Amino acid sequence: MFVGPQRSARFEPDTMTKSSVPPNAPVALPPLVAAYVEATNSFDLERLMATFAEDALVNDQLRDHWGKPAIREWVKREIIGVRLTMNVTKVITHYENFIVTANVDGNYDKRGLPDPLVLAFYFTAQSDLIVQLIILRNRYDI
């Protein structure tokens, strides 16, 4: 799956620099991440839930949602309820972790938020399922 202009790289501490990844280089998302993004952008509750392990943890902006029942309620409210969409701009693979940067949009209260709103999604995978997802609004101005 290709989702707009992206940059992707495997993290190598001694050789990785921002300039080593060409801007706007399209790259396929890891299959699990692609499934999550596709389900999010199509507002498909069941496909989105199929990406998570039974005992997964989602931490969205410092709020924990443990296990599929809690994650289902979070998805209904915070993704489907506000018609959230993701435009992936960068992916970094680090072992079984995928760090995805995306511009997000939807029908949520945007007062006081930057445009575009850029969020970082920290996926941890095991057995082709998301076992942990941490979503943060990182600061890039420091």
Tell what function each PLM region has.
Residues 2-46, 50, 54, 142:
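Short, low-complexity N-terminal intrinsically disordered segments enriched in polar/charged residues
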Residues 2, 11-23, 73-142:
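A beta-strand edge to alpha-helix "cap/lid" segment located at domain peripheries
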Residues 45-49, 54-95:
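A solvent-exposed, acidic/Ser-Thr-rich amphipathic alpha-helical stretch
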